[in-house]
Structure formats: C-alpha cells, structure tokens
Amino acid sequence: IPIKRTMNDTSRELHLIGVAEVHYWHGFDRLIHGLAEYYRTNPEYKVYFHIVGPLSGIREQEEILPAIRDNHLEPYVILHGPLHSDKLDEQFEKADFAIGSLGRHRSGIAHIKTLKNREYAARGLAFTYSENDDDFDSAPYVWKAPADESPVDIMGLVEFQRALTMTPLEIRESVYPLSWKAQMQKVIKEAGFGSLE
C-alpha cells in the first residue's frame, strides 16, 4: 500500500475521501448532511468529499443523490465511481482526511475491525469512523463520530484535522503491529518455531 507522499495545503480547503462500494452502513449520507449544515453558514473554508466507488443500490442512491442535489452540494461532493491502481493512488494523494464507516449501527454492528480503517492508516491518512475498533479508538489521528443518525459535525472534523501534527509516516508506523508480518510473528513465536527473520 503506497504511503501518502505530500502534505497538502489545508489553510483554505480540506479534501475528504471515502473509498467503498457504498452501502447504507457506510453512512456517507451522514457526512453529506453534515456538509449541508456546514455550507448553510456560508463558510470561507471549503470542505470537499470525494466518494470513490459505486453506489451499490437503489437505497444508497436514494440516500445520497437527493441529499447532494437538494442541498446544492454538487461542487463539494464529487462522485468518482470506481478507481483502481494509479488513479486511486492519485485521489489518495489529493486527500487530507479519510472517511470510514459512519453507519455500522444501522446493521447492528458495534464492534468491527475493518480493512478500510487499516488501509487509511497504512496510507498515512487520519480518518473518522463511528464503530468501535480497539486498534484505533484511542489513536491520536482518529476522530470518532457518534454511532447514531446525527449529521457529521464538519466544523469539529475540520478543527481536529487542522490541529493534527502527525505525519503520514508516523501514522503508517503506528500500525506496524497490525501488519501480517507482525501478526504472523506472534503465531510463529507462540508455536515455538522461532521467527520470520
């Protein structure tokens, strides 16, 4: 997984990225409703949400597309569709903060360890989510959203991100203990076979 190479200038705008085959449990509609509330105040500071991946079904389309249209968020919510390889990496380079699942409570899940959160950290991005994930809940680069139907507090997210001092490399290094190599080392040691080295 490539690490984010550049720190973008976030003094005037912030670019959020959510990568998924979008289902209702991703709760991206909560972020869009948060953006609607944010933009009602006519802020100078601009926040953009880049959704990478398809909207998986009618339910997701009905939750997301009208929320964008009715709140005139077309300039701020960008639907990229599925992207892979270099095109996906380019979007991650442009991003400043990542969006994990904000609606796992909708499917009755309170605790989950998603691969997406791990990918975001491995790429060196700070991120948000609403479920419980023991590996990240107290990480200094994670801004936890409540596990409910409230619109995401965009100003709170912006303030968190702007106060963040960790570099992409520091974020990536924090997840080394979660890597396959580190996890398999534990298994091999427990089984009494020495080490992977």
Residues covered by each model-derived region:
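Nucleotide-activated donor-binding/catalytic signature segment of Leloir-type glycosyltransferases, i.e.
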Residues: 53, 61-90, 97
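Nucleotide-sugar-dependent
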Residues: 26, 86-90, 98-119, 128-139
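A conserved amphipathic alpha-helix that caps or lines the catalytic cleft of carbohydrate-
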Residues: 32-39, 68
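Conserved donor-binding/catalytic core segment of Leloir-type glycosyltransferases
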Residues: 7-26, 32-35, 50
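A short acidic/histidine/glycine-rich donor-binding loop in glycosyltransferase catalytic cores
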Residues: 139-148
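A charged, aromatic-enriched C-terminal amphipathic alpha-helix characteristic of glycosyltransferases
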Residues: 5, 149-197
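Flexible glycine/serine/alanine-rich "lid" or loop that lines and gates the nucleotide-sugar donor pocket
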Residues: 93-94, 122
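Short donor-sugar binding/catalytic loops of nucleotide-sugar-dependent glycosyltransferases
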Residues: 19-24, 55-56, 83
